[in-house]
Regions:
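Membrane-proximal intracellular helices of multi-pass ion channels
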Residues: 1-275
Length: 275
């Protein structure tokens, strides 16, 4: 994919993300009838991305004009988010779970980790509950960051900045993206285990860990974590949300044991002041 345009790469990645929930069907075979509603838009996005890579016009990232290059990066990120929202809405709409506008609303809320929902979770199948949580988890990372983790190009930094990431953990951008992703995965595993230890079922634990880390707010329960009436579960949720809202550079300092240096960061001080 080295010579592929960044828009094409991102379209392919979004398609794969939409297909990903199909992997849980081995655990919930009763939802197999919904598989086509994820595979169809996902594969079409992958195909469209492949066509853009093969025949599309390369972005003008090699202009000597820095402003022009940054403008193209901004346009690519803007296009990617609109594409992600449109493709992400399709499983809800094609399956008849939601009307078209409602599907777009749910997709926007999921990818942007806003947390507002129009779905009745008490009547929703497992695959859609997982999909909503997975959208928030991926949205918390950002499409561009995930792409940079897999492939890097000469203008990856422009795209990275255009999506609004302040974290520069490593000298190399790809290493930065991989470090953030690894931390995000580790926190997800730890959060899921913590929920299970506190008495939450495994499926709900995974979904709530994804939504808490992204500070998104989706839930598999009508009353969210209040459904469990458990102080330990609420404490785990608070900790995960604090982790999710903290700069990854600060988290890396804490992981490396540089506590004093971390608490000198103004962002951390202000956070504790608010708490």
């Amino acid at each position: 994919m080295k010579d592929c345009s960044n828009r094409g790469k991102l379209m392919i990645m979004i398609g794969l993300l939409v297909i990903a929930p199909v992997t849980i069907l081995s655990f919930y075979p009763q939802d197999i009838g919904y598989a086509a509603f994820f595979l169809l838009p996902g594969l079409l996005s992958v195909l469209a991305g492949g066509l853009v890579c093969a025949f599309g016009k390369r972005e003008a990232y090699f202009s000597s004009d820095r402003l022009t290059a940054q403008r193209h990066s901004n346009n690519t990120v803007l296009f990617t988010w609109f594409w992600g929202i449109a493709v992400g809405a399709m499983p809800f709409f094609l399956s008849g779970q939601l009307r078209f506008v409602q599907s777009l609303f749910e997709s926007v809320s999921g990818w942007t980790t806003t947390g507002l929902s129009v779905m009745d979770v008490t009547q929703t199948s497992k695959i859609f509950l997982f999909y909503r949580s997975f959208m928030q988890y991926c949205g918390g990372l950002g499409f561009v960051l995930m792409m940079v983790m897999l492939v890097s190009g000469k203008r990856s930094m422009d795209l990275f900045n255009a999506e609004g990431h302040p974290d520069k953990l490593m000298p190399n951008l790809k290493q930065t993206a991989q470090t953030i992703f690894e931390m995000y995965i580790i926190f997800l595993i730890l959060g899921t285990v913590a929920y299970v230890v506190c008495g939450m079922p495994l499926f709900d634990s995974l979904c709530h860990a994804m939504c808490s880390l992204s500070t998104g707010g989706f839930s598999t329960k009508l009353n969210s974590i209040g459904e469990y009436r458990s102080l330990p579960i609420e404490i785990v949720t608070i900790v995960l949300m604090l982790i999710g809202t903290t700069n990854f550079a600060v988290l890396l300092l804490l992981i490396r044991g540089k506590w004093r240096q971390a608490f000198h960061v103004s962002e951390v001080r202000f956070l504790f002041l608010l708490l």
